[in-house]
Amino acid sequence: MSLLQVLHYPDERLRKVAKPVVDVNDAIRRIVDDMFETMYAEEGIGLAATQVDIHQRIIVIDVSESRDQRLVMINPELLEKSGETGIDEGCLSIPDQRGFVPRAEKVKVQALDRDGNSFELEADDLLAICIQHEMDHLVGKLFVDYLSPLKRQRIRQKMEKLARMTARAEK
């Protein structure tokens, strides 16, 4: 397994729409394993392949405190959603920034697991929010897109400044 580079906003590659996985094979399983390793190293609870510049419909999630309840969703599709909720969301692609995002309280999704088997999952609370957040990434949508233009611009400026400082430090 290896750590993958997480793209940071406003990198335009985060806006690419992911393509469906055609065949769940060893290469896809390696991507899944690397995504989990990266997500845990970054102390995240979810990661979409788009965030690591892999534009396929793959999501990994683990919202457990014990970090041992891995959820793999390949080619996820939202079947149902209900209720309303929302929290101040963060994102590995937008470090140290948060913003309130309205979400459905409950979702029902269909996806393929790590072995290519189809499953359905009903989720609520943090898991439902995380699934919606990660599925947004697969269509090039970020949590900042739900914020006011002013707040989005402030976050963009902070992220651009961070990128400049990081680039200088690497020279």
Swiss-Prot record:
Cite the binding residues for Fe cation: 91, 133, 137
**What keywords tag this UniProt record?**
Hydrolase, Iron, Metal-binding, Protein biosynthesis
Q: Which Pfam families match?
A: Pep_deformylase
Keyword Coiled coil recorded: no
EC identifiers of the protein: 3.5.1.88
What is the role of the protein in this entry? Removes the formyl group from the N-terminal Met of newly synthesized proteins. Requires at least a dipeptide for an efficient rate of reaction. N-terminal L-methionine is a prerequisite for activity but the enzyme has broad specificity at other positions.
- Protein name per the record: Peptide deformylase
